[in-house]
Regions:
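Ser/Thr/Gly/Pro-rich low-complexity, disordered linker/stalk segments of secreted
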Residues: 128-186
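Residue-level detector of intrinsically disordered terminal segments
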Residues: 10, 16, 70, 118-120, ...
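Extracytoplasmic soluble-region selector
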Residues: 24-141, 146
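Carbohydrate-active catalytic/glycan-binding domains of CAZyme proteins
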Residues: 95, 176, 180-632, 637-679
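Serine/proline-rich low-complexity intrinsically disordered segments, especially terminal tails, linkers
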Residues: 18, 25, 32, 46-47, ...
């Protein structure tokens, strides 16, 4: 999940800030105590964020303890947060403090008293709300070498992406006004330039950073769940480092043909720092997903890493939410009822043919001292938010992080990212930070090492100067429409943008399974996967569906600043809407494209679209075939009413056959909701 070797140190530093209330030695003691039935004492919370004037009582949690002899509470800074003799904290003014509780206790299996000092870090904020500042990712001119995408024979017509039902009917409000273009400004070029080039299928997204992919198949579509690196980009800026600390949401996309992707947007799961679902979680990294029938209906479960030391779970009744917190607490890791002997990082979830589900996890950061550097696997209970049975180690050689688990044929495949250590013996040819795999006859193992399947992506997609762009990776294997595919991430998009920030982008290439069940090495490239089916332009198409785009955004983010201008946190707004990003000095038209649309033998008669814009404004909309300046199918002016709404049906040129479509906008669009042709 992390990108650079130095991130090992960075993650350790991040862990020291997030895993509060105990040191790593404390985690070791707690995990060991659980397994050996020894006494444990800990605080009800390791970190609190309070507003000035608020009060909160810390409680002592104990296990296998016969008697508490004494408790002494102290604060490192009473002017910020005071604490009473009974553990009640009073937040006084903005700042930070550490609350300590010195506990003297006697274990059930002992007559001697032991003493332990527990900690809770407290952050006190002013009792006022900061003003949100909405920002957009800067538009840069990318340097991308176009690649050729192989043509695939069409097979079936893809199904449309599911549409979430609105929860209420909004009361119309007047649309915001826009800043008019300066007529004296002449655009440097006619069309915005795509960060991913004109013909490439990789990366999957051209207008945002999204990483740590996990893919599942559901009802004829593949859904990909990713970490929202764009959130970190907003917090750090083009010249900042990707430290993952601002990421509190996941990004979800889906496709029926592996080329045209519908952007379902971002979903804030962690709420400890921003306005997310689960207030006890600070970060949302490396989400994974599965579904199973519960009470006769399909139910979806998202597992993710909370700051590198805990794993949380959210539930939903559809693959794209809305998501809800069914468990109400962290699932796995320190300060939970499921402490692990390993590092609770980078979960992967697998549901077997019999309906049994398993969670596998692990990493090399925050691992309890003395424990083996191996991933762990544990069977989930039927409710999917608790466990059924004990965890077991998978003895994966040179394991680092990023687990995956699949069933291929009659074998169970465990895959993972290798570490940076020097190899010896039978593993001397195993690349650093590559994806390796093992096989077993049972989900719980034992697993046998097979080999490497995905070399380090930085040896394929290099830096602008031609040197290797070595980084850790994160992957996902999925079977879709009879074939296997490997999802992974690279920093190709940031290289194209010419920025320092190591934003990661998800790719996909085919994974070939040989007759004996082993894998060929995945051939990584920008071509990606050939289109699996013709696209139907006569269905209602979400404006969030595209194979490529430029000068357009889909997700939205609020950057919350302190008074001195320093970023406090970055809140990702749930969902998405396709909108133009106006930069008149650089380009005239923003655009999106659809690959492989079948217009039929007679071609369309009309083009329909629904948009939102600025009140009483207008935008020029064009639809062209096969190129940005290709054959015009539609060229019309869209006029918005005072509410910013527009719904059009205009004549279309009867272009026949299969074509790539380019939908182009000269002007400002707040939300390109949907479109379709009619015969």
């Amino acid at each position: 999940m992390r990108d650079y070797k130095k991130a090992v140190l960075g993650m350790t530093l991040a862990l020291s800030m997030v895993v509060t209330g105990s040191s790593l030695d404390g985690i070791t003691a707690s995990a060991a105590a659980k397994s050996s039935k020894k006494a444990t004492v800990k605080l009800s919370s390791g970190k609190l964020i309070l507003k000035a004037g608020a009060k909160k009582t810390l409680k002592l949690k104990k296990k296998n303890v016969k008697k508490i002899k004494s408790m002494k509470w102290t604060s490192s800074k009473k002017s910020v947060a005071a604490v009473s003799k009974k553990g009640k904290i009073t937040a006084k003014k903005a700042g930070k403090a550490v609350i300590r509780c010195k506990v003297k206790y006697i274990a059930k299996a002992s007559k001697k008293a032991k003493t332990k000092t527990l900690k809770c870090r407290v952050v006190v904020k002013k009792n006022t709300k900061a003003t949100p500042v909405v920002t957009k990712a800067p538009q840069k001119t990318p340097v991308v070498t176009p690649t050729t995408v192989p043509t695939a024979a069409p097979t079936t017509v893809p199904t449309a992406a599911p549409t979430l039902s609105p929860t209420s009917t909004p009361v119309p409000t007047l649309a915001p006004t826009e800043t008019p273009d300066d007529p004296a400004v002449t655009p440097a070029q006619t069309y915005a330039t795509s960060y991913k080039g004109m013909t490439a299928n990789n990366p999957l997204l051209a207008n945002s950073f999204a990483s740590d992919p996990t893919a599942i198949e559901y009802n004829g579509r593949v859904y990909v769940y990713m970490s929202n690196d764009t959130q970190e980009h907003y917090g750090q800026g083009d010249d900042g480092e990707n430290g993952f600390g601002y990421i509190t949401s996941m990004h979800v996309i889906s496709s029926a043909d592996m080329v045209n992707w519908t952007d379902h947007g971002t979903f804030s799961l962690a709420g400890g720092k921003a306005d997310g679902l689960e207030s006890y979680s600070n970060c949302c990294w490396a989400p994974c997903a599965t579904y199973k029938k519960v009470n006769g209906k399909d139910k979806f479960f998202i597992y993710y890493t909370n700051g590198g030391y805990q794993i949380n779970v959210a539930s939903a009744d559809s693959p794209t939410g809305p998501f809800y917190d069914e468990r109400k607490s962290s699932l796995l890791g320190p300060w939970t009822d499921n402490e692990s002997t390993g590092d609770a990082l980078d979960p992967a979830v697998f549901t077997d043919d019999d309906g049994s589900s398993y969670l596998v996890w692990g990493g090399d950061c925050g691992r309890p001292e003395g424990s083996k550097k191996y991933p762990r696997i544990r069977k989930l209970a039927d409710n999917m938010i608790s466990f059924d049975g004990e965890e077991k180690a998978i003895e994966a050689p040179y394991f680092f992080e990023d687990s995956g688990i699949n069933k291929v044929g009659d074998k169970y495949v465990y895959s993972y990212c290798t570490d940076w250590d020097t190899r010896t013996g039978q593993y001397k040819d195993l690349d650093i930070c590559s994806i390796a795999y093992m096989v077993a006859d049972s989900p719980m193992g034992p697993y046998k090492y097979v080999g490497e399947v995905l070399p380090n992506c930085g040896t394929v997609f290099k830096k602008a100067d031609g040197s290797d762009d070595l980084a850790n990776n994160h992957h996902s294997i999925v079977q879709f429409k009879g074939e296997y595919y490997m999802f992974y991430h690279t920093t190709v998009l940031r290289t194209s943008m010419g920025i320092h920030f190591a934003g990661r982008s998800t790719h996909v290439n085919k994974l070939n399974v040989k007759a004996d069940g082993t894998f060929d090495i995945v051939q990584q490239n920008l071509d990606g996967v050939p289109q699996l089916a013709d696209f139907d332009p006569y269905q209602t198409v979400s404006g969030l569906t595209s194979s490529n785009n430029a000068g357009m955004g889909a997700i939205e983010t609020n950057v919350i600043y302190h008074k001195n201008g320093k970023v406090n946190y970055v809140n990702s707004i749930d969902g998405a809407k396709m909108h133009t990003i106006k930069d008149r000095a650089k380009y005239k038209y923003s655009w999106l494209s659809i690959k492989g649309a079948d217009l039929g033998d007679n071609g369309p008669k009309t083009f329909q679209a629904k948009l939102k814009g600025y009140g009483l404004g207008s935008v020029n909309l064009k639809v062209c075939a096969d190129a940005l300046d290709g054959t015009e199918i539609v060229n019309t002016t869209v006029n918005f009413d005072k509410y910013g709404d527009a719904k059009i049906e205009v004549p279309a040129a009867a272009v026949q056959g299969k074509h790539d479509l380019y939908i182009e906008f000269d002007g400002s669009v707040l939300d390109f909701e949907s479109w379709q042709f009619a015969k």
